[in-house]
Every structure is written in structure tokens, then in C-alpha cells.
A protein has these predicted regions:
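N-terminal cap/leader regions of alpha/beta-hydrolase-fold enzymes
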Residues: 1-246
């Protein structure tokens, strides 16, 4: 595997980004791997690398780059307060702009195939992935939200509002015990996406809680469910961004 830490020049500053890909048999389809609230870290590097081993050029950006290059979450009340402040600095529109910058960079790299792009967002980035799919329908052809939050809200930028523009296949992995994504919201999301003709699947992961895919999340980590999520997203990418370019 090839691993690089690079800085992408954007109109908003330098976006430090972890990039990983196989060392043979390229060029590769691009996958945007969007972090959860605790930020870009080694745990996510490992997860992104897991995806890359299946034949993808995976980009994991620090979405907090406008405020800090290296955010380190501390599991204390003050640490949580700092994390929430970082989260509040982001919007769906800003995340879409970042995805555009990532794709622009990837298109200039000879190891990418310049074809359909995949995107996966975790927790706070679930809506970012869906928003990117609606804003960039000509490029993003597969998107996944893993225990995502704020997928359907009353705000003007709620990701469901432009779902009719999505051309990608969408996958939602929902944690059964997730207090941040209650069943009422998910049912409303399901009904709305059906009404606009989105190609999607919502899957509930039984007896799991928010953050179940992360190995360092202690009791919240559910290895069988985490492995299933990898199976689902890799299958999603295979159908939509790999097979169409080989």
C-alpha cells in the first residue's frame, strides 16, 4: 500500500489529507472518506486503508482545517465542548466545497481513473456525504452514511431537500440504539427518498449504538456489525464506481 499525507490548496486554506491506495494495478476509482466529530486520526487512517486495499484511491481530509491542522479529541467535558465548537464550524455546503477540492486534486493524480467517485461519511459527516451526492451528481455515484446524524431536519440545508438531484446509489447504516438518529426521523427520511425516486437502502443494525464501527470506541464497538458495514460499503462501491470503469 502507498500512504501519503499531503496538503491540498483550497480557497479556504491548506486541507491536510491522508491518501492511500494500492501500489499496483492502477489507476483507481476515488473514495472520499469523511471523518466523524473526533477528527482525523490513526483509527480512521486504518479504516480508510482497509477500503483502499480493495482497489480504491481513498482520501481522508481533516475537515477542521479552516480552524486547526491537528484536532485531538480529549474525552473530558472540556474536550467535548471543544469538539462541539469544531462541529459547529462546519456546514453541509462547506463540506461539499471540500469534496469538490478533493476531486479536483484527485483528477490531477495519474493514479486515479477520473471516473465515478464514492463517498462515505461517519456520524456528523453522514449528511455531508449525502449533500455531496446531490451537489455533484455527475461525479458521485455511490454514497454512504454510517450512523449519520441530521439527515432530515427543518433547516434550509437539510440534505434531504435536494435528494431529487442525486444520481448515486445511497446506503444508510443506522444504529438501533442511536439517540442521535431516532426512528421517527429515519421513517420520514425513508418516505421522502421514496417520493423523489432516490436509489437507496436504509439498514438498521440490531442492538448497536452510535459509533459502533470504531475499534477504539470501547463498549460501543461492535465488531460483527463493523465488519458488515465494510461489506456493505465495499459492495456499494464495487457496483457503482469500480465495475463501470474496468
Amino acid at each position: 500500500m502507498i500512504i501519503n499525507e499531503i496538503e491540498i490548496e483550497t480557497p479556504f486554506g491548506l486541507m491536510n489529507t491522508f491518501i492511500t491506495r494500492p501500489d499496483e494495478n492502477g489507476p483507481f476509482p476515488v473514495v472520499l472518506f469523511l471523518m466523524d466529530a473526533p477528527g482525523k486520526r490513526e483509527e480512521l487512517h486504518d479504516m480508510a486503508s482497509r477500503v483502499a486495499t480493495s482497489g480504491y484511491y481513498v482520501m481522508l481530509p481533516n475537515l477542521y482545517y479552516r480552524r486547526t491542522r491537528n484536532f485531538v479529541f480529549e474525552p473530558t467535558p472540556l474536550g467535548r465542548e471543544k469538539m462541539l465548537a469544531q462541529m459547529a464550524s462546519l456546514t453541509n455546503d462547506l463540506a461539499v466545497q471540500d469534496c469538490q477540492e478533493l476531486i479536483k486534486y484527485a483528477d490531477a493524480d495519474p493514479y486515479t481513473n477520473k471516473g465515478p467517485v464514492g463517498c462515505v461519511g461517519y456520524c456528523m459527516s453522514g449528511p455531508f456525504a449525502i449533500s455531496a451526492a446531490s451537489a455533484l451528481p455527475n461525479r458521485i455515484k455511490a454514497a454512504a452514511s454510517i450512523h449519520g446524524v441530521n439527515l432530515l431536519t427543518d433547516k434550509d440545508d437539510s440534505p434531504h431537500r435536494k435528494a431529487n438531484q442525486i444520481t448515486a446509489e445511497i446506503y444508510f447504516a443506522m444504529a438501533e440504539k442511536d439517540k442521535w438518529a431516532d426512528p421517527t426521523m429515519v421513517r420520514a427520511l425513508d418516505e421522502h427518498l421514496k417520493s423523489v425516486g432516490t436509489n437507496f437502502r436504509i439498514e438498521w443494525y440490531a442492538d448497536t449504538d452510535h459509533g459502533f464501527v470504531f475499534p477504539n470506541r470501547g463498549a460501543f464497538y461492535d465488531k460483527p456489525a463493523a465488519e458488515k458495514h465494510f461489506e456493505r460499503i465495499l459492495s456499494l462501491f464495487d457496483r457503482n464506481i469500480k465495475r463501470t470503469t474496468t
